[in-house]
C-alpha cells in the first residue's frame, strides 16, 4: 500500500509523518484529518487517552499515528483486524465526529480499506487547501474511495484494487460511507461490511 497526501491541519510536513506507518506486522495509511470544529488537531489534545508507547511504536507524530495506535490497542485487546478498525473509529468519533477516518491497513493475510467520512460535503477548509494547489474542482472527490475487482484471462476473480480520490475512475465501485472492504491477500476474495 502507498499513499500520497497533504499534511493534516496545522501539522508540519516531516518524514516521520509520511505514510505508510508500520508496526506489529501491519502497514497503515490514513487519508483524513482528525481535528475539532476549530481545526485543532488531535495531537494538540494532551488529554486524549492513547497509549504513549503504542503511539511511539508507529514511528509517526501525527493524527494518523494516533489513529493507527488506537487500532493497535484494539488488536491487543483481541479484536480481529476489521473489528479493531471499526472500534477505533467509534472511539475517535466520540471526540471528533466530523473528522475523516478513511484508511487502509494491511497485514500478511488481509487488506482492509475503510471509507468513514464525518461529513457528507467537503469542508470549506479542505476546498481552500485544494484551491491553493490549483485543484479546487477536485475537492468534492476528497473523501471518495473506490474498489475494482480484477479478473484473470479466464474471467475468474483474481483480486481487488482499492483507490481514493484524484482521478477519473470508470468501471470502479464506490465504497459507501461507513463501509469497509476486507480482502484476502491469499486468494483475492473480498467482502464488504458496515462499521
Where are the predicted features?
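N-terminal segments that mediate ammonia production and transfer
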Residues: 2-195
Amino acid at each position: 500500500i502507498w499513499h500520497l497526501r497533504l499534511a493534516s491541519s496545522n501539522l508540519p510536513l516531516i518524514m516521520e509523518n509520511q505514510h505508510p506507518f508500520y508496526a506489529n506486522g501491519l502497514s497503515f495509511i490514513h487519508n483524513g484529518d482528525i481535528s475539532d470544529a476549530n481545526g485543532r488537531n488531535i495531537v494538540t489534545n494532551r488529554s486524549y487517552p492513547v497509549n504513549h508507547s503504542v503511539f511511539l511504536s508507529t514511528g509517526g507524530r501525527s493524527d494518523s499515528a494516533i489513529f493507527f495506535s488506537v487500532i493497535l490497542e484494539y488488536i491487543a485487546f483481541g479484536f480481529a483486524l476489521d473489528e479493531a478498525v471499526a472500534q477505533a473509529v467509534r472511539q475517535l468519533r466520540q471526540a471528533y465526529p466530523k473528522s475523516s477516518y478513511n484508511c487502509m491497513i494491511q497485514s500478511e493475510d488481509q487488506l482492509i480499506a475503510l471509507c468513514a467520512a464525518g461529513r457528507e460535503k467537503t469542508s470549506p477548509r479542505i476546498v481552500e487547501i485544494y484551491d491553493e494547489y490549483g485543484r479546487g474542482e477536485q475537492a468534492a472527490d476528497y473523501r471518495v474511495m473506490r474498489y475494482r475487482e480484477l479478473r484473470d484471462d479466464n474471467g475468474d476473480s483474481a483480486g481487488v484494487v482499492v483507490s481514493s480520490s484524484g482521478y477519473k475512475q470508470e468501471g470502479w465501485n464506490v465504497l459507501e460511507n461507513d463501509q469497509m472492504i476486507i480482502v484476502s491477500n491469499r486468494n483475492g476474495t473480498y467482502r464488504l461490511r458496515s462499521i
